[in-house]
Amino acid sequence: MGKKSKEFSCPKEEYVKYNRYNKYEKPVPMTPNHEKYHNLLKDKSKKIVICNGWAGTSKSISAIYYACQSVLNGESKGIVIVKELFDGAGFLPGTEIEKWIPKVKQLLTYIECFMQCDYRTLLEDETVVIQPLTYLQGTDYTGYIMVVDEAELISPEMMYCICSRGANRIFINGDTSPLQANEKLAKVGKSGLSFLLETMSKSTSIGIVTMDSEEDIVRDGYIKEIIVKMQPALEEFKTRKRS
């Protein structure tokens, strides 16, 4: 059986003032592509679920929600958050893991809401593990569920490493649009996300969904308008810049 979420304790007046554990609600599919994504996340026969699409399409919150349900239902030991190394990490104060908190804070906030527990407690007892890609090789995450965000920044070699760590299931999110292409990966021709989509697309144990419609963007008001209008323009600009 997996570990149960910890009981929340807080002075009542503080709880009423700001209950961060209720900041986000269960994600609800809003479009046909969302529905397909949720069905794949719920389908335990799909060991790897890949969502490729624009920002604002609820990729991350949906993956985290179903990962949390897997832990709460005793189907997984915990959640492993996999992230690419970012510039300047070594200059930040704190322990190795503390340096990574700002990079994954939004995902941890989702986890707090869906597991009703402070993320620091979950990190302490390894119900949640932050795994920098740099140190992934040689690890064994049998029994865990992995969540990989910003997969377009990962190399093909590291994507292979991720998929061979023995996790119960792996939820991989990313965006293969030119705007999100990594300059370093341009030298090898493709990202790990593109490599995985090309080599494993016909596998029956892998589910793939592409958020390729404007209606898939669920951000409110002007944010959606910015994504819809600016992303294509930025992609064109970036393509011209490379040529």
Locate each region found by the language model:
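Conserved helicase motor core of SF1/SF2 NTP-dependent helicases
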Residues: 2-40, 46-243
